[in-house]
Amino acid sequence: MSVDQETVKRVSHLARIAIHDDEIEPMTKELNVILGFVEQLNEVDVNGIEPLTSVMPMALRMREDSVTDGDKVADIVANAPVTEENFFLVSKVVE
């Protein structure tokens, strides 16, 4: 895969990055070099190798899931000017 000047313009527009006409050609070359490095990574044989989440061995601590209200209801509704039965009361905005 290679990047052309139109692709650079399109990507810069989508990313909302201002790029001047004199910067398009060098950017095209730079992106093609980067893609070349990525294509080299595709040549590496990784069959039989487990994916890593970290270079340090980690064990997941398991716990039983339990549903709670967070014990913060009083703190949360304390910020509202008007509440009813632990719900915020607001004026009707749609008729």
UniProtKB/Swiss-Prot annotation:
* Pfam families given in the database record: GatC (PF02686)
Entries under SUPFAM superfamilies matching the protein: Glu-tRNAGln amidotransferase C subunit
Instruction: Name the domain of life this protein comes from.
Output: Bacteria
Q: Name one GO molecular function term.
A: asparaginyl-tRNA synthase (glutamine-hydrolyzing) activity
Catalyses:
L-glutamyl-tRNA(Gln) + L-glutamine + ATP + H2O = L-glutaminyl-tRNA(Gln) + L-glutamate + ADP + phosphate + H(+); L-aspartyl-tRNA(Asn) + L-glutamine + ATP + H2O = L-asparaginyl-tRNA(Asn) + L-glutamate + ADP + phosphate + 2 H(+)
E.C. numbers: 6.3.5.-
Extract one GO BP annotation from the record.
Answer: glutaminyl-tRNAGln biosynthesis via transamidation
Keyword Chaperone carried by entry:
no
Q: Does the keyword ATP-binding apply?
A: yes
- Record's keyword terms, sorted: ATP-binding, Ligase, Nucleotide-binding, Protein biosynthesis
Q: Which InterPro entries match?
A: Asp/Glu-ADT_sf_sub_c (IPR036113), GatC (IPR003837)
Judged by the first EC level, this protein's enzyme class is ligase
**Record function comment:** Allows the formation of correctly charged Asn-tRNA(Asn) or Gln-tRNA(Gln) through the transamidation of misacylated Asp-tRNA(Asn) or Glu-tRNA(Gln) in organisms which lack either or both of asparaginyl-tRNA or glutaminyl-tRNA synthetases. The reaction takes place in the presence of glutamine and ATP through an activated phospho-Asp-tRNA(Asn) or phospho-Glu-tRNA(Gln).
What is said about its interaction partners and assembly?
Heterotrimer of A, B and C subunits.
UniProt lists the family membership as follows: Belongs to the GatC family.
The protein depicted here goes by the name: Aspartyl/glutamyl-tRNA(Asn/Gln) amidotransferase subunit C
Q: Which organism is it from?
A: Bartonella quintana (strain Toulouse) (Rochalimaea quintana)
The organism's lineage is: Bacteria, Pseudomonadati, Pseudomonadota, Alphaproteobacteria, Hyphomicrobiales
